[in-house]
UniProtKB/Swiss-Prot annotation:
Task of the protein: Member of the two-component regulatory system RprX/RprY.
SMART domains the UniProt entry points to: REC, Trans_reg_C
Residue intervals of the Response regulatory domain: 9-123
GO molecular function, one term: phosphorelay response regulator activity
Organism: Bacteroides fragilis (strain YCH46)
Subcellular location: Cytoplasm
Protein name, per record: Transcriptional regulatory protein RprY
Length: 236
């Protein structure tokens, strides 16, 4: 969990030395603590030794690419926000980043102001989550703790990523009602552009897999509108 009273500590991995130094200096000037590493291997070693609040990874790096690095980081910490920087603009590459669990994806060239905006947008979501009281939802045979981001059924507990938790929380708040697609996108992703919409589709697929142990639960598409979480009404 990010401590808002401490200086935000960013793990920055970028193999372009000039760009990396510019990014580090700019972020430090904005009040962040940014540590720069030239490849994914060095970045992961630093991640294991130190505590970071947010990661910014270039995709194409030597020794270990950004996608592989993100997967390893996610395995160790499902909550830490990750932003990808890349020159890749193919839809397949961008979707691959979101499948891994990226919180945002910025294509090069980009402005320093844009990166700062994306970081601040993520922080607003974290602050909002931190300020909310814990809600525990009963979803069929599942119990979902929004604060701990844990989905449980019987003795099985699944730790959800931040975006999985946020999206499932919205679906639970609108259980058996239509969750409007635009509302969900602007609430969680800030922007309802094409790539964010595809990212949300990926997370819906992940949530369906998490919920597959209870046949009474279903997330259905409502064409042109959004999604609906079908779940038995809780017993009174």
């Amino acid at each position: 969990m990010i401590d808002m009273d401490e200086k935000l500590r960013i793990l920055l991995c970028e193999d372009d030395e000039n760009l990396g130094m510019l990014l580090r200096e700019y972020l430090q000037a904005k009040g962040y603590s940014a540590e720069l590493y030239p490849d994914g291997e060095a970045g992961f070693k630093a991640f294991l030794k130190n505590k970071y609040d947010l990661c910014v990874f270039d995709v194409m790096m030597p020794k270990k690419d950004g996608f592989t690095l993100a997967q390893e980081v996610r395995a160790a910490n499902a909550e830490i926000p990750i932003i990808f920087l890349t020159a890749k603009t193919l839809k397949e590459d961008i979707l691959e980043g979101f499948k891994i669990g990226a919180d945002d994806y910025i294509t090069k060239p980009f402005s320093m102001e844009e990166l700062t905006f994306r970081i601040e947008a993520i922080l607003r979501r974290v602050r909002g989550k931190k300020n909310k009281e814990s809600n525990v939802y009963k979803i069929g045979k599942f119990t979902f703790d929004t604060q701990k981001q844990i989905l449980a059924i019987g003795d099985k507990q699944t730790k959800l990523t931040t975006k999985e938790s946020e999206l499932l929380g919205l679906l639970c708040a609108h259980a058996n009602e239509i969750l409007q697609r635009d509302f969900a996108l602007k609430t969680i992703w800030i922007d309802d552009n094409y790539f964010n919409a595809r990212s949300m589709d990926v997370y819906i697929t992940k949530l369906r897999k998490h919920l597959k142990d209870d046949d009474s639960i279903e997330i259905i598409n409502i064409h042109g509108k959004g999604y609906k979480l079908i779940t038995p009404e809780p017993e009174s």
